[in-house]
A protein has these predicted regions:
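Contiguous transmembrane helix-bundle modules in multi-pass membrane proteins
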Residues: 1-128, 133, 215-257
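Soluble non-transmembrane domains of integral membrane proteins
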Residues: 118-208
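Short beta-strand-plus-loop segments that form exposed binding edges in beta-rich domains
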Residues: 211-213
């Protein structure tokens, strides 16, 4: 139930930039045509780019198109010509951009995330989507109040190494408990992380591997919404108001002698 309602809400939000208080202003054709075309093109390419992660999701495609349509509509309709850049208008822009970016991140994580479990050892790489994980070695560590074993994994995309992950399995002697410290490689367009499991041999370990595309965009969208709300609460005082034209003062009449 939530997904259809969210898609309907996103579709309605794409029309917000065309609304004006108490009326619907006529928009130029370019402002009506360009946003949906950009959303369809970029959203389609974004969805097709994740084909190697699984089957193409039509719900994910529609959500991508609507999110990018909203972004294009907001940016195209936001101008400084009439009222200057006020905190009120900038707050509205940031809040709605935050909704679109957050929705885009949630959609990618929901439909295109990948995870897998395996026993990884030297000479036996593991493929997860477009990424290949290779075991490089292990080393013992002594921390302030724990001992640990750290595993080094190299991550390749094609022939290029894109990251190195170093998950740890820690033992706290005071609490007599073991804890796992995941290895994380974060990026703007996706996060890779590995959780270390039990040791299965001299150079073999059970592991859970994850790929979360655009997961950071969820937090980015939330921060933009918070910033937009704070600006809206700060008032309507213009930040970059256009300067009024100076009107020359009339010459004073000379007083009669």
């Amino acid at each position: 139930v939530f997904v259809p309602l969210a898609l309907v809400l996103m579709a309605l939000m794409t029309q917000i930039p065309r609304l004006r208080w108490q009326c619907l202003a006529a928009s130029p054709p370019i402002k009506r045509i360009v946003p949906p075309l950009l959303g369809l093109l970029v959203g389609g390419l974004l969805s097709l780019g994740y084909r190697d992660l699984g089957a193409l999701s039509w719900v994910g495609l529609v959500a991508n198109v609507l999110s990018l349509w909203l972004v294009a509509s907001l940016l195209l309709n936001f101008s400084f010509k009439t009222h200057g850049l006020s905190a009120n208008r900038l707050g509205s822009l940031l809040a709605h951009l935050g909704v679109a970016i957050c929705a885009l991140g949630i959609n990618q994580v929901s439909h295109y995330s990948q995870e897998g479990g395996t026993v990884l050892k030297a000479g036996s790489p593991y493929q997860l989507g477009a990424y290949t994980f290779r075991y490089e070695g292990n080393e013992p560590l002594i921390g302030p109040n724990y001992t640990a074993e750290r595993i080094t994994l190299s991550v390749h995309k094609g022939a290029k190494e894109v990251a190195r992950l170093m998950p740890e399995r820690r033992h706290y002697s005071v609490r007599t408990m073991n804890m796992n410290e995941p290895g994380i490689a974060w990026g703007l367009f996706g996060d890779l992380y590995v959780v270390l499991g039990e040791k299965m041999g001299p150079d073999a370990y059970a592991m859970r591997l994850h790929y979360k595309p655009l997961v950071r965009w969820i937090w980015l969208g939330g921060m933009l919404m918070m910033a937009g709300g704070a600006l809206r609460l700060s008032g309507r005082k213009p930040l970059l108001a256009s300067r009024p034209a100076k009107i020359p003062r009339p010459l004073r009449e000379q007083e009669a002698p």
